[in-house]
């Protein structure tokens, strides 16, 4: 909530945000809904796909993560390490799903806009 308040007041605010989780993104959407700046509508995307993300305005675009599989692998690796195995870093790739809703819009470039890396 406070981050978007700060960024929205910049002379050239970011056009998009990726939030670590849906709760943070919902806070950003809440700020934008309550804001007096009717012309600032950045794209917002996050990770989790919690139920509440379907009921925001606009509905939140999110990445659905395989939470059960992530938990199973974490427990398996932890158990192996406790038993003396898995001493090296473990790299695992899991399938995720992008749930496209209404919080992301097409980007239209303008002249002289700065690049942001947040």
Enumerate the language-model features and the residues they cover.
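Flexible loop/turn connectors
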Residues: 1, 5-117
């Amino acid at each position: 909530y406070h981050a978007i308040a700060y960024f929205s007041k910049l002379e050239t605010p970011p056009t998009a945000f990726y939030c670590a989780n849906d709760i943070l993104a919902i806070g950003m959407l809440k700020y934008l809904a309550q804001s007096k700046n009717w012309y600032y509508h950045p794209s917002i995307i996050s990770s989790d796909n919690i139920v509440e993300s379907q009921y925001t305005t606009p509905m939140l675009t999110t990445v659905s993560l395989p939470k059960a599989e992530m938990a199973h692998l974490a427990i398996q690796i932890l158990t192996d390490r406790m038993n003396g195995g898995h001493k090296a870093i473990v790299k695992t790739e899991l399938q995720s799903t992008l749930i496209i809703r209404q919080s992301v819009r097409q980007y239209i470039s303008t002249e002289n806009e700065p690049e942001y890396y947040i």
